Amino acid sequence: MKNNKKLRTWLDDFNLSHPLVIAGPCSAETEKQVLTIAHELKDTDVSIFRAGIWKPRTRPGMFEGVGAIGLKWLKKVKEETGLMTTTEVANANHVKLAIENDVDVLWIGARSTVSPFIVQEIADALEGTDKIVLLKNPVNPDLSLWYGGIERLYSSNIKKLGVIHRGFSSYSKSKYRNNPEWQIPIAVSYTHLTLPTTRHV
């Protein structure tokens, strides 16, 4: 994949004098919660409202998100606040439902990035759309997986791309929940110099 300035034009189109800010609840739990937070954020520097609709959990029986009903809440956020919206997608059906509900930005989570099959399924489902797609780093510090995900999306003619640095899981004791391993996002930015990179907090 060649270094391509078109990959970041979507970010330039925001015409911001500050970094792009994406904020919102980790999980959408109720319509009231989502709308209350969105209204509190609308007059800040936040440009995109985020909320997890589907939550990938390690074990069954844990809260796995409210599901598709939450997309209706995101639609209300757009209507009432004017904020753009984003949520995580992990398969082709998620993509279909998000597009049907006019979600502006789709992100692929760290657990999905580790699977070329999942990334390819999502890339195929997004082909021909004009959505902004953000790809989190894989759970493990594997640069090739991150590159591969970017390349799969780009090969499906998805040109509004960005990456999210969330840090990496580690078996060793650390003061961080996720180790930054800064050399990896730096390597990605050097290889794809015009690809927007965001930091997950």
Question: Where are these predicted regions, by residue range?
Answer:
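N-terminal amphipathic alpha-helix/helix-capping segment at the start of soluble metabolic enzymes
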Residues: 1-22
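Active-site mouth loops of central-metabolism enzymes
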Residues: 20-34, 86-88, 174-177
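Glycine-enriched alpha-helix->loop->beta-strand junction motifs that scaffold or abut catalytic
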Residues: 45, 99-107, 125-132, 154-160
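Glycine-rich, proline-tolerant flexible connector loops at the mouths of alpha/beta enzymes
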Residues: 50-68
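Alpha-helix-loop-beta-strand connector modules within alpha/beta enzyme cores
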Residues: 64-84, 125-128, 184-190
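Catalytic beta/alpha-barrel core
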Residues: 84-91, 104-116, 132-141, 164-165
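Catalytic alpha/beta core domains of metabolic enzymes, predominantly
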Residues: 132-193
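Single conserved hydrophobic/aromatic residue that forms the stacking wall/gate
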Residues: 192-201
